[in-house]
């Protein structure tokens, strides 16, 4: 396995670790509605950081974006909005199926759809089937899916042991939402594929290869921001128990505390895709679709490890932890299989 591929896998792991940890600061926010907290974090992660970093990278910010036609920018934006819809469905999936089943189904579907639809759309799927390296990477995707399933099973055992149930368990509604979440969340993978002309243009301007994908985040995350912020602001305006004014009428130290923690959560959320861009840059072009598989499977892996570190699995017994550990090992094996396949 080449150093470039190894570093690509490593950066995807770092990004996934940030994704697995980003919600920790949000949990310490006090006396704010989820909508206000999510909006503040989202403004940081979807608007302020993408725009600021792009302004630092590009020699002429406005000239860069104005150089693209609407036919180039619109698909990137719409796929970003598609991913934003997946974000909202994610929370509803947890509500009706519970954390473990919801995450397992949603992540499993988005892993498959986001990974395999890109080569199918680009007309390259036959290359994967007809080459040794392609078949090896497909095997890695399958093994990763098995690993996600094992970790999901561990989560179910944990919830059963701890007596945790879905807020409003509804299998039919939950499955529909999980499928929708999985499909729509893959919009980020599709957006990265559609943004290739933007990456090439950034490279032509002398932007370091590790950073060429970052300017496209202004458009991708702009689409996601409109969906997420629109959802939050509508709820803040219409739901009687929610009030943006009330959230910002708290004592000043508490407001500062909440803003800083929400901003930190937003920063950590953004860093997952900052390092995703680094990993994506190191993956061979013919296998760039594998970036999504690495990100999603590592997200599940890191989520399990973070849970162990935070002692969330204490008092659950040996079996859930053993199953979780097995799932994590399978995901690590999958990453190695994919790496070997790309090297071939």
From Swiss-Prot:
Catalytic activity of the protein: L-rhamnopyranose(in) + H(+)(in) = L-rhamnopyranose(out) + H(+)(out)
Family the entry assigns: Belongs to the L-rhamnose transporter (TC 2.A.7.6) family.
Record-annotated disulphide pairs: none
Swiss-Prot/TrEMBL keywords: Cell inner membrane, Cell membrane, Membrane, Sugar transport, Symport, Transmembrane, Transmembrane helix, Transport
Principal location listed in the UniProt entry: membrane
Cellular location(s): Cell inner membrane
Membrane topology field: Multi-pass membrane protein
Pfam families: RhaT
Gene: rhaT
Highest rank taxon of the organism: Bacteria
Lineage: Bacteria, Pseudomonadati, Pseudomonadota, Gammaproteobacteria, Enterobacterales
Molecular function in Gene Ontology: rhamnose transmembrane transporter activity; symporter activity
Recorded GO CC terms: plasma membrane
InterPro entries linked to this entry: L-rhamnose-proton_sym_RhaT
Protein name (Swiss-Prot/TrEMBL): L-rhamnose-proton symporter
Function of the protein: Uptake of L-rhamnose across the cytoplasmic membrane with the concomitant transport of protons into the cell (symport system).
Database matches in HAMAP family: RhaT
Transmembrane intervals: 4-24, 38-58, 68-88, 101-121, 137-157, 175-195, 214-234, 259-279, 290-310, 323-343
């Amino acid at each position: 396995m080449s150093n470039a591929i190894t570093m690509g896998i490593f950066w995807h792991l770092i990004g996934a670790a940030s994704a697995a940890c980003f919600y920790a600061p949000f949990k310490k926010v006090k006396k704010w509605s989820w909508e206000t907290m999510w909006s503040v974090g989202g403004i940081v992660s979807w608007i302020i950081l993408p725009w600021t970093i792009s302004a630092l990278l590009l020699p002429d910010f406005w000239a860069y974006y104005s150089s693209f036609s609407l036919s180039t920018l619109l698909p990137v934006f719409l796929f970003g909005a598609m991913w934003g819809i997946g974000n909202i469905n994610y929370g509803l999936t947890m509500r009706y199926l519970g954390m473990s089943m919801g995450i397992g189904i949603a992540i499993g579907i988005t892993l498959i759809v986001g990974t395999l639809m890109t080569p199918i759309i680009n007309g390259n799927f036959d290359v994967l089937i007809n080459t040794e390296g392609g078949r090896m990477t497909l095997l890695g995707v399958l093994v990763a899916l098995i690993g996600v399933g094992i970790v999901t099973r561990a989560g179910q055992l944990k919830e059963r042991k701890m007596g945790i149930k879905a807020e409003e368990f509804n299998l039919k509604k939950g499955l529909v939402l999980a499928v929708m979440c999985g499909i729509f969340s893959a919009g980020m993978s599709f957006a990265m594929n559609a943004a290739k002309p933007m990456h090439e243009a950034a490279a032509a301007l002398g932007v370091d290869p590790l950073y060429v994908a970052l300017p496209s985040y202004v458009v991708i995350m702009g689409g996601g921001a409109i969906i997420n912020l629109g959802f939050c602001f509508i709820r803040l305006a219409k739901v009687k128990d929610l009030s943006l004014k009330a959230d910002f009428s708290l004592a000043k130290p508490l407001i500062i505390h909440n803003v800083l923690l929400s901003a930190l959560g937003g920063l950590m959320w953004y860093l997952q895709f900052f390092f995703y861009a680094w990993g994506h840059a190191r993956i061979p072009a013919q296998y760039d679709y594998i970036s999504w598989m690495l990100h999603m499977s590592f997200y599940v892996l890191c989520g399990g490890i973070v849970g162990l570190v935070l002692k969330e699995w204490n008092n659950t017994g040996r079996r859930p932890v053993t199953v979780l550990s097995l799932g994590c090992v399978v995901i690590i094996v999958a990453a190695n299989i994919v790496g070997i396949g790309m090297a071939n």
